[in-house]
Amino acid sequence: MDEQPRLMHSHAGVGMAGHPGLSQHLQDGAGGTEGEGGRKQDIGDILQQIMTITDQSLDEAQARKHALNCHRMKPALFNVLCEIKEKTVLSIRGAQEEEPTDPQLMRLDNMLLAEGVAGPEKGGGSAAAAAAAAASGGAGSDNSVEHSDYRAKLSQIRQIYHTELEKYEQACNEFTTHVMNLLREQSRTRPISPKEIERMVSIIHRKFSSIQMQLKQSTCEAVMILRSRFLDARRKRRNFNKQATEILNEYFYSHLSNPYPSEEAKEELAKKCGITVSQVSNWFGNKRIRYKKNIGKFQEEANIYAAKTAVTATNVSAHGSQANSPSTPNSAGSSSSFNMSNSGDLFMSVQSLNGDSYQGAQVGANVQSQVDTLRHVISQTGGYSDGLAASQMYSPQGISANGGWQDATTPSSVTSPTEGPGSVHSDTSN
């Protein structure tokens, strides 16, 4: 409707005066009694009515539009407008090829389908939650609670996405329908081809597609933030408690020459730490890899655990010596038998300190002095009973001559006091 006044102003004189069909209509309408002034007056009234349509109310506009469509000069006016359009080629374009789908929009659609946000709801959020659970690992009630929270949050994101997408589609359809109806209505007065209507619809959809892309992009960002938060939280919760870490580190550094626990040792460690055997195996595998990659960094930690083991063994030895020699507590040459309540733990400590288990670790000077003190205390106690090997907690392993790992023999060299003081030996170096 905006083009009508401009077109009529620019081409009224030429088109309407020079058009033969329109002249014939004017002559027929005016009759023989009316002159040139009457025809100009009639044309001026039509143009004035067209100019004032935009300023009228809806009811008045509908009445004027109906009067215009029923006017006897309406066909002549339409023919003039068609000729003007053909001459000036206004809004005439060839059939445009269908534009390819935006690759960014395709990536967003694929991501939303993979995360279970788009597409059918059945199994979508559950599948995404199961994938997140498999990636994070772990088990237990805490893990199930986290998965429930993840599914709830994902379902909320999905609901918001579909609600906004429905609003978007509804607004796009309503606006497209309104424009198409408006163009069809205007096509009764001015020439508008169906191809031009289709082109206008494609322009509207292209404008709305930017809104759709923004909605999908924000939804994908929300899903990624949700996944990162839950995966990070699960990764933090997978850390063992301090007591379990201490137990595993003590065993690792006391068997540093061969940190490969047997199945029995793994089961015992799993019971002590309150974890599964597979978690114990995974922990030792990761610990060996980290230790090999950065030996210098873990050397200080190894020295700390070695000193702690030495102090514990010294206290146990002194306590056992006093318990077995109550009449002569200060006797240094006592050859009485020395029995321990926890001989397996002490043997593990003595084996590590008196043998070759730490020869590759370069124990510090302060730790070496504690080792010498421990050996002196052992020489004062006289010896150990032969039942020590039977109560051994872990199976020590050694390195064979060809460089492979093998089980060490039972430490039969732990003998009675008949061999003399300080006769404790370790067989882990075979």
From Swiss-Prot:
UniProt keyword Transcription present: yes
InterPro entries with a match to the protein in the record: HD, Homeobox_CS, Homeodomain-like_sf, KN_HD, PBX_PBC_dom, TALE_homeobox
UniProt site positions, description: Required for binding to the NFIL3 promoter: 286
Domain PBC per the UniProt entry, residue ranges: 38-232
Region (Disordered): 1-40, 317-338, 395-430
Regions of compositional bias (Low complexity) in chain numbering: 323-338
Site description Breakpoint for translocation to form TCF3-PBX1 oncogene, residues in chain: 88-89
Tissue specificity field: Expressed in the kidney. Expressed in the endothelial cells of the glomeruli and interstitium (at protein level). Expressed in all tissues except in cells of the B and T lineage. Expressed strongly in kidney and brain.
One GO location term (cellular component): nucleoplasm
Sequence segments annotated as region (PBC-A): 45-124
The entry's DNA-binding region: 233-295
Feature: compositional bias, Polar residues: 407-418
Transmembrane helix as UniProt keyword: no
Highest taxon of the lineage: Eukaryota
UniProt comment concerning the protein's domains: The homeobox is required for PBX1 nuclear localization and for transcriptional activation of NFIL3.
Clinical disorder: Congenital anomalies of kidney and urinary tract syndrome with or without hearing loss, abnormal ears, or developmental delay: An autosomal dominant disorder characterized by variable congenital anomalies of the kidney and urinary tract, sometimes resulting in renal dysfunction or failure, dysmorphic facial features, and abnormalities of the outer ear. Most patients have hearing loss, and some may have global developmental delay. A chromosomal aberration involving PBX1 is a cause of pre-B-cell acute lymphoblastic leukemia (B-ALL). Translocation t(1;19)(q23;p13.3) with TCF3. TCF3-PBX1 transforms cells by constitutively activating transcription of genes regulated by PBX1 or by other members of the PBX protein family. TCF3-PBX1 binds the DNA sequence 5'-ATCAATCAA-3'.
Homology family: Belongs to the TALE/PBX homeobox family.
Subunit details: Forms a heterodimer with MEIS1 which binds DNA. The PBX1-MEIS1 heterodimer binds a cAMP-responsive sequence in CYP17. It also binds a consensus region in the SOX3 promoter. PBX1 forms heterotrimers with MEIS1 and a number of HOX proteins including HOXA9, HOXD4, HOXD9 and HOXD10. Forms heterodimers with HOXA1, HOXA5, HOXB7 and HOXB8 which bind the 5'-TGATTGAT-3' consensus sequence. Also forms heterodimers with HOXA5, HOXB7, HOXB8, HOXC8 and HOXD4 which bind the 5'-ATCAATCAA-3' consensus sequence. Interacts with PBXIP1. Interacts with TLX1. Interacts with FOXC1. Interacts with MN1.
Protein name: Pre-B-cell leukemia transcription factor 1
Source organism (scientific name): Homo sapiens (Human)
Chain's gene name: PBX1
